[in-house]
């Protein structure tokens, strides 16, 4: 498949930043303290996650990417920026001293995930006036906006971003989360998966009712399009 040329595209991505951390090693015994495997950790890898992973995917296509989000004032934020810089992504991170950078630690053995530990606290109650100011300034030099919502609080008020972008004639694509899609009204396109759509319209019995429900939701939210991804998560 031949992909279109994205080298001239300028994309502004706003959303929940995460660092995905993987510890891996062999398992050969059960802990004497509890009936759980003991992992002899021999490897560690950090990857951009959440909206940061979206930014990497878009940058890999050749687009010029600016990424806005909130993180802690900590080592994991530094690691995340370093990882993203290798993809020439312009990072506009707002560091919140009383928060940790959202980090998901997965313990792996023999290509299987044994455990996941989440280090996170919502950014929903954090003042976002500085982020909105930077967003408005960045709009003048981008072609399209992507809102990557993982319900971690950075996009607690997506309407303010959608309105600002649409006022400047920018298309807005939303990767939604949760059961309230009203907050994404008037976006250009939203891209829910099947489970996310069902959370809003209820489970559907057949393909015809699924399509009808999606079309009804598109109309009620005044969207230009609704792209349903065929996965459950």
PLM regions and their residue ranges:
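Structural motif
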Residues: 12-14, 116, 143-146, 173, ...
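Gly-rich Lys/Arg/Thr-decorated short loops/hinges at beta-loop-alpha junctions or inter-strand turns
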Residues: 32-39, 109-123, 192-199
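Short acidic, glycine-rich surface-loop motifs adjacent to enzyme active sites
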Residues: 142-154
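Conserved phosphate/ATP/ADP-binding segment of small-molecule kinases
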Residues: 152-233
């Amino acid at each position: 498949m031949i992909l279109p040329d994205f080298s001239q595209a300028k994309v502004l991505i706003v959303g929940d930043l995460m660092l995905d951390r993987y510890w891996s090693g062999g398992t050969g015994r059960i802990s004497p303290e509890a009936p759980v495997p003991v992992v002899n950790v021999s490897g560690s890898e950090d990857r951009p996650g959440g909206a940061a992973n979206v930014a990497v995917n878009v940058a890999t296509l050749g687009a010029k990417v600016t990424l806005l989000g909130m993180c802690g004032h900590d080592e994991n934020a530094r690691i995340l920026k370093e990882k993203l810089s290798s993809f020439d992504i312009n990072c506009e991170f707002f560091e919140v001293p009383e928060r940790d950078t959202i980090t998901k630690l997965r313990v792996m053995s023999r290509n299987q995930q044994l455990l996941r530990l989440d280090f996170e606290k919502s950014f929903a109650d954090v003042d976002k006036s500085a982020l909105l100011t930077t967003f408005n300034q960045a709009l003048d030099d981008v072609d399209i906006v992507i809102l990557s919502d993982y319900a971690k609080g950075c996009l607690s008020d997506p309407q303010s971003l959608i309105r600002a972008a649409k006022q400047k004639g920018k298309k807005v694509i939303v990767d939604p989360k949760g059961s309230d899609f009203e907050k994404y009204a008037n976006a250009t396109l939203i891209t829910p998966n099947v489970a996310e759509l069902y959370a809003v319209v209820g489970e559907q019995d057949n393909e015809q009712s699924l399509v009808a429900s999606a079309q009804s939701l598109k109309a009620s939210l005044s969207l230009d399009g609704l792209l349903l991804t065929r996965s459950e998560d």
